[in-house]
C-alpha cells in the first residue's frame, strides 16, 4: 500500500463539508488558529502527520475520523477496514482518540435541520453577537464560537442543553 497515494486518493474524495467535519473532530489535536490556513484534506493530513496523529504505521486516527463522518466507502476502499471492525475497535476502552464530547457535538450538528439551525442562532443571540452568527455559519462553526467564548466545553454544557431542549427534545 502506497501511503501517500492513498492519502491523496482519500483527500480527493472529501468535499468541503467532509473537510469541515474532519477539522472539527481534530480540534483537540490541532487548535482552531492552526486550522484556519487548512483549505483541503491534504493540508489537514499534513498537519496530522506533523502531530504524529497520522503515520504509515498507525492509521487509527484517520480510520476513526472517516468512520465518525460516515465515509465508510473510503474506509473500505483505501484502508481495508469494515464498519464492524471500527465499531468493535472503538468499544475497547481507551481506543477512541476523538473525545466523546467532540463526537456528541458532531452528532448534534448532523441531526439539526435548517430551521432548527435558525432557531439555534436566534436563541444564542444573547451569548454570541448577531454579526458572529451570520447566515452561512453552520452548527460546527457555532460550537467553535461558543468554545472560544468559554460558554461550551466538556464541563460546560448548560447553555447547549438549554438550547437543544428548547429546539428539539430529541437532541
What residues fall within each predicted segment?
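Plant-biased recognition of short, low-complexity, intrinsically disordered N-terminal tails
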Residues: 1-3
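Alpha-helical death-domain superfamily interaction modules
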Residues: 6-10, 21-171
